Amino acid sequence: MSVALRDPCISQSQFFAWAQADGGRWEFDGCQPVAMTGGTVNHSRICGNLSAALRRRLRGSGCEPLGQDAGIATVGDAVRYRDALVTCTRVSGGAYLVPDPVVVFEVLSPTSGRTDRIVKLREYGAVASIRRYVILEHASSGVTVLSRAGADDDWTAAALTAEDTLAMPEIGAGVPVAEFYDGVEFAPAAE
């Protein structure tokens, strides 16, 4: 029988101090830092398109899109960094965490699917302000949208394709899915 040894848990504030000094990309599982890997060029293109589309539509609305560097506190002091989010609450420029995200976006990578679809869905479900969780595929132009009317409601799932528009009534915006994938080069389908 083998036993995995784990360092003693650290606090969220210790995590932020450590991560600042380290300079790498890390999430916090509520006990220990968890390394985040870099993404592909397609991942970067999708994130850039997402950020530009949201910023254009939300300018002057009172809601603000934020990128990958601001965290969300989830279950048990865990800190998650997603690819984008929208908040309608003004957040201090020096803050590490966004207190009231409304829409959260994750762009899948070859290794993040399980975490993004299962673990983060559960954790984001514990954040009362989140009304929509949008998961963008990286290998095709498919989008999974999970939405709920309130914090105590179950998620409702919908699948979108490049011909659809992502409607986000909670922030008064909609974006054609094809816009997220502009310039993205997909590998040819296997025959």
Which positions does each model-derived feature cover?
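Gly/Pro/Ser/Thr-rich low-complexity, intrinsically disordered segments predominantly at protein N-termini
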Residues: M1-E191
